[in-house]
């Protein structure tokens, strides 16, 4: 259960000695910066990978739901349903609107 040491070599040794509760902690400032940058880099890569996976999943789910919605609630299924109810001789006028739903009126 020891700490892993970095293999980075330092040319200038600038050390900070902190004394807390009679214990001496010696740390090198460049090593601390190197570890912080490494942690930030690893966290950034992890966050970016997670966001890309979420984007891919949402695109796939969106395509699936759009296809399913078009099949079940699309204009063709509404026309077929209306033809089955009123018979094939009924005249159907589809009024275009700028919304997601389509209004069907009989002429």
Swiss-Prot record:
Provide the protein name.
Non-structural protein 1, peptide 1
Q: List the disulfide bonds.
A: none
Instruction: State the membrane topology.
Output: Single-pass membrane protein
Q: Which family does it belong to?
A: Belongs to the rotavirus B NSP1-1 family.
Q: Spell out the GO cellular component terms annotated for this protein, sorted alphabetically and separated by semicolons.
A: host cell membrane; membrane
User: Would you indicate the residue range of the signal peptide?
Assistant: none
Cell location? Host membrane
Primary localization class, coarse = host cell
TM spans, by residue? Answer: 39-59
User: Which keywords are on file for this protein?
Assistant: Host membrane, Membrane, Transmembrane, Transmembrane helix
């Amino acid at each position: 259960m020891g700490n892993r040491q970095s293999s980075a070599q330092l040319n200038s040794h600038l050390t900070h000695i902190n004394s807390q509760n009679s214990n001496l902690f010696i740390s090198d400032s460049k090593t601390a910066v190197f570890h912080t940058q490494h942690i930030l880099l690893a966290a950034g890569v992890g966050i970016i990978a997670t966001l890309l996976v979420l984007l891919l999943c949402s695109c796939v789910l969106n395509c699936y739901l759009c296809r399913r919605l078009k099949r079940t609630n699309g204009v063709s299924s509404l026309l077929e349903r209306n033809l089955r109810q009123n018979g094939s001789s009924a005249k159907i006028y589809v009024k275009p609107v700028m919304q997601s739903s389509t209004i069907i009126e009989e002429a």
